[in-house]
Amino acid sequence: MVVRIPLGAKTRSGPFHANMIESWFLNDPGLVIVFPSNPQDAYDLLVEAAALPDPVVYLEHLGMYGLRGGMTGWGDRIHMQVDTESVAKAIESGDTYKLGKANIVRGGSDATIVTWGAMVHVAMKAAETLS
């Protein structure tokens, strides 16, 4: 079972704007939490979540919705060709593809910024400013 939950701030986002509820679910045993940061993550995590026997909470930041011209709610361009084959091959072979694995977006030696979801784009801007 996959439960998709929109959250996060964006213009006219109604009851979703003030809640970042991932911490509510993180300590529940047997519950898988996913939070995509780009269109490829969104596809891969949804397909992989649907194949799991465990319940999955699929959190979706509203800033990633309605990408006009590939723009996030923060003005970042994330045009992406989505690969629909790699995750399917991993599932068919019984492997995990992205679940349970960290995605290191940028390496470095001075500081560590840990984030998830749409905030990856904000963290990347911060890292660029700090470098």
Positions of the model-derived regions?
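Conserved thiamine diphosphate
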Residues: 1-114, 119-122
